[in-house]
From Swiss-Prot:
Keyword annotations: Cytoplasm, Methylation, Protein biosynthesis
Compartments it resides in: Cytoplasm
Changes after translation: Methylated by PrmC. Methylation increases the termination efficiency of RF1.
Entry's Gene Ontology molecular function annotations: translation release factor activity, codon specific
Protein's organism: Methylocella silvestris (strain DSM 15510 / CIP 108128 / LMG 27833 / NCIMB 13906 / BL2)
Protein's UniProt name: Peptide chain release factor 1
Entries under Gene3D superfamilies matching the protein: 3.30.160.20, 3.30.70.1660, 6.10.140.1950
Any one Gene Ontology cellular component term annotated for this protein: cytoplasm
Main subcellular location of this protein, as a coarse class: cytoplasm
Residue list for modification N5-methylglutamine: 233
Length: 360
């Protein structure tokens, strides 16, 4: 049985926040309350559905316990009670999932970084394919995609591309995409029909706010330079490109896509903030990992998480042994949700097992 006192507290808080949102409050407080309301809304609905079903089960059980209930009604009630108990069990599971502790960053926008790995030109082309997959997926969700920095490959694709994906719940959807992605296919330049293997790495960082990370100007080394195009040639005459080094952590960011130095600096600072915030989160996660079974994969960015085999039309996620023979739909973003939803379900099941065994 679920702790009813805890459920009562959640419903009371939901009503309080709902009432506060209808009052005149400071803009900053309104944003804070709106976020809390969004988190409580799903849980409150799950509690009400569960309790409504519980009442139905209790009503049918009372009918069966009543000696005045005739045999025909008793037979109907027994059948309905079996169905009602099954529905109650499903709703209880859904409620337990809704009550699991949330990642504080789940509702945030995200920084997506895709880098070509081993495989030369083919790796850069694959990095381009991955970026377009996420771009199309984001567009299907109504999120916006803005490129922060891009370094194109000689034959196409990208050696590295960094973008901001803005929208509600972006990080929750994309956070399990971090890791090494491998592709197996016959390159266009391959005359013998041999399958080549190449790789690209993906990093998904929750977008950090200024309040999340304190950065002192004294800890920064800022270099300006002229932006460069493919092959290293200078593409403008002003020193608009920015490289910022955070001395305490050794984190370096470089942005040159905008013609304005001011805009490049703002983007570089936002990227730096998100990287430092992500490093802090990873450190905390690593400290907790020894006591938890809930992590999908090791969380290591170098871990090979997925293989895209073009000759077989196959996508395999190695962390949960998921194989889909619909690579054409996954690589266009159309069926990416099938992979993401399976990873999320696996993660939630592990979290639930942890909580029920006292692991959380």
């Amino acid at each position: 049985m679920l702790p009813q006192e805890k459920l009562d507290l959640i419903l009371r808080r939901y009503d309080e926040v709902s009432a506060r949102l209808n009052e005149a409050v400071e803009p900053a407080l309104y944003v804070q309350l709106s976020r809390e309301f969004a988190g409580l809304e799903q849980v409150a609905a799950a509690i009400r559905d569960y309790r409504s079903q519980m009442q139905e089960v209790e009503g049918l059980a009372a009918m069966l316990a009543d000696p005045t209930t005739d045999s025909e009604m008793r037979g109907l009630a027994e059948e309905e009670l079996r169905d009602a108990k099954e529905r109650l069990e499903a709703l209880e599971h859904q409620l337990k999932i809704a009550l699991l502790p949330k990642d504080a960053a789940d509702e945030r926008s995200a920084i997506l970084e895709v880098r070509a790995g081993t495989g030369g030109d083919e790796a850069a082309l694959f990095a381009g394919d991955l970026f377009r997959m996420y771009q199309r997926y984001a567009e299907s969700k109504g999120w916006s995609v803005e490129i922060i920095s891009a370094n194109e490959g000689a034959a196409g694709g990208f050696k590295e591309i960094i973008a901001e994906i803005a929208g509600r719940g972006v990080f929750a959807k994309l956070k399990f995409e971090s890791g090494a992605h491998r592709v197996q296919r016959v390159p266009d330049t391959e005359t013998q029909g041999r399958i080549h293997t190449s790789a690209a790495t993906v990093a998904v960082l929750p977008e950090a706010q200024e309040v999340d990370v304190e950065i002192n100007e004294a800890d920064l080394k800022i270099d300006t330079m002229r932006a460069q195009g493919a092959g290293g040639q200078h593409v403008n005459k002003t020193e608009s490109a920015i490289r910022i080094t955070h001395i305490p952590t050794g984190t370096i960011v470089f942005v040159q896509d905008e013609r304005s130095q001011h805009k490049n600096r703002a983007r570089a600072m936002a990227l730096l903030r998100s990287r430092i915030y992500d490093e802090q989160r990873q450190k905390l996660d690593a400290e907790r990992a020894a006591d938890r079974r809930s992590q999908v994969g090791s969380g290591d960015r170098s871990e090979r998480i997925r293989t895209y085999n073009f000759p077989q039309g196959r996508v395999t996620d190695h962390r949960i042994n998921l194989t889909l023979y619909k690579l054409d739909k996954v690589i266009t973003g159309e069926a990416l949700d099938e992979v993401i939803d399976a990873l999320t379900t696996h993660h939630q099941a592990a979290l639930l097992a942890d909580s029920e065994s006292g692991g959380l």
